[in-house]
């Protein structure tokens, strides 16, 4: 079991992207894009904390309380910079939504952060296998989430600038 409180786990391909970030300049289109994040967590306290931290980072937050609501939200509106899903939610699991997102062209560009109260290696591996960009064990710290949002956004911009890299 992983016990580091400040741990942020990223897919293996992210270090390559992180390395090239110094050369990435945000495009005008990227700068004008709304900074929206979808937060889906069935725990009201965690959802509120995630939303408040994202808002402090300048994001507009759309918050839902279960997987089915997250799915419906994405079907109606795919204009999110980042999605944060609890691994296990009622009605539809976070990992099931991630798998679906990776099959839809309009959704696959959205980086997904999976949060879990169970920080085991299996949960982390399952998250990455489903297509998550990052895995965050609970309890989360404000600093940890802020850093993660910045890395995920930079990763997305790098992929936009260099679509055939990594």
Regions found by a protein language model. Give the residues of each.
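Acidic, metal-coordinating helix/loop segments flanking the phosphotransfer/catalytic sites
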Residues: 63-82
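Charged docking surfaces used in two-component/phosphorelay signaling
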Residues: 48-56
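Short amphipathic alpha-helix used as the core "switch/output" element in two-component signaling
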Residues: 72, 95-108
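C-terminal output helix
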Residues: 140-150
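The feature encodes the CheY-like receiver
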Residues: 47, 89-91, 108, 120
